[in-house]
């Protein structure tokens, strides 16, 4: 279930303060955040936010198409190592 519409979108307070401060000064700095649950709002468009994925911060450039999504959607937390090679499996079984 989604969040109640009367509550509005969740955005981390400190992240929102940093975005507003950068908008006032007109600077374009990378903002580090651990708040993957924060929703992307129109004020964030044009900024680069480094979202933590559990191992490192992944830089995400915010565009208009991303509005309404969560920051965590753009920083995957799992690595896919790939499936085992079929030839390698057959060789192991014969030995």
From Swiss-Prot:
Matches recorded under InterPro entries: Ribosomal_uS19 (IPR002222), Ribosomal_uS19_bac-type (IPR005732), Ribosomal_uS19_CS (IPR020934), Ribosomal_uS19_SF (IPR023575)
UniProt KW keywords: Ribonucleoprotein, Ribosomal protein, RNA-binding, rRNA-binding
One BP term from GO: translation
Cystine pairs: none
GO CC aspect terms: cytoplasm; small ribosomal subunit
Record GO terms (molecular function): rRNA binding; structural constituent of ribosome
Taxonomy, superkingdom: Bacteria
Pfam families (UniProt xref): Ribosomal_S19
Gene3D superfamilies reported in the protein's UniProt record: 30s Ribosomal Protein S19, Chain A
Protein's job: Protein S19 forms a complex with S13 that binds strongly to the 16S ribosomal RNA.
Record PANTHER family: RIBOSOMAL PROTEIN S19P FAMILY MEMBER, SMALL RIBOSOMAL SUBUNIT PROTEIN US19M
Family statement: Belongs to the universal ribosomal protein uS19 family.
UniProt-recorded name of the protein: Small ribosomal subunit protein uS19
């Amino acid at each position: 279930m989604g969040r109640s519409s009367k509550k509005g979108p969740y955005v981390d307070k400190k992240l929102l303060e940093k975005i507003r401060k950068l908008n006032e000064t007109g600077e374009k700095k990378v903002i580090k955040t651990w708040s993957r649950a924060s929703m992307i709002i129109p004020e964030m468009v044009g900024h680069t936010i480094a979202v933590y994925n559990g191992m490192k911060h992944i830089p995400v450039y915010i565009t208009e198409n991303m509005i309404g999504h969560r920051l965590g959607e753009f920083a995957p937390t799992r690595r896919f190592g790939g499936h085992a090679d079929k030839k390698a499996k057959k060789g192991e079984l014969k030995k």
